[in-house]
């Protein structure tokens, strides 16, 4: 295969369920290794923690009690030196609704 046909692809995975993110990352790495391309990752990126504090009492009277709601966003990064054939195979991977994928050609 010609060198011009190979490109580096940066894949960013993120989602609220870390098990789903890890499972999709494992599938991508296994597919890339099976096809014989160079893979770097999955690299765990810092988990983003979103916290929302709300007052329990709707009227403002009474005790000052608060609820804390939290959502954690897990992220993984994978670099692949891939050809068009590998990218087509990557598109066939089933991805849960809780996982989002960004592809970037570098």
Swiss-Prot record:
Q: Which SMART domains does the protein's record reference?
A: Ribosomal_S10
The record's section on SUPFAM superfamilies has: Ribosomal protein S10
According to its UniProt entry, one GO biological process term is: translation
| Cross-referenced Pfam families | Ribosomal_S10 (PF00338)
Q: How is this protein annotated for GO cellular component?
A: small ribosomal subunit
Q: Which GO terms describe its molecular function?
A: structural constituent of ribosome; tRNA binding
Gene3D superfamilies in the cross-refs: Ribosomal protein S10 domain
Entry keyword set = Ribonucleoprotein, Ribosomal protein
NCBIfam families for the chain:
uS10_euk_arch (TIGR01046)
As for family, the record states: Belongs to the universal ribosomal protein uS10 family.
Summarize the subunit comment: Part of the 30S ribosomal subunit.
Please describe what this protein does: Involved in the binding of tRNA to the ribosomes.
Q: What is this protein called?
A: Small ribosomal subunit protein uS10
* Organism the protein comes from: Pyrobaculum arsenaticum (strain DSM 13514 / JCM 11321 / PZ6)
According to the entry, what is the taxonomic lineage of the organism?
Archaea, Thermoproteota, Thermoprotei, Thermoproteales, Thermoproteaceae
